[in-house]
């Protein structure tokens, strides 16, 4: 099981900032998250980057029991 951290609009869509979700790969964990959190989360997920332990990874990347999956929506802002 991987610890999943959700930020900004992903957190809002899921209704939580973190969860523990079973899956052997990033893709399996994300599919399980979509099933758990519903269509609004699925829509937001399509705009997000997914990192594992601070690294950008492919969907087929294997996950271990202590891995942390971060779902990061695009950010903007700052000063001009």
What residues fall within each predicted segment?
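Ubiquitin-like/PB1-type beta-grasp interaction modules and other compact soluble beta-rich domains
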Residues: 1-80
């Amino acid at each position: 099981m991987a610890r999943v951290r959700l930020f900004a609009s992903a957190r809002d869509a899921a209704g939580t900032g973190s969860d523990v979700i079973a899956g052997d790969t990033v893709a399996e964990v994300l599919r399980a998250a979509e099933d758990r959190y519903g269509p609004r989360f699925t829509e937001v997920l399509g705009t997000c980057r997914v990192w594992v332990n601070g690294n950008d990874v492919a969907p087929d990347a294997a996950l271990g029991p202590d891995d942390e999956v971060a779902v990061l929506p695009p950010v903007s802002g700052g000063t001009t």
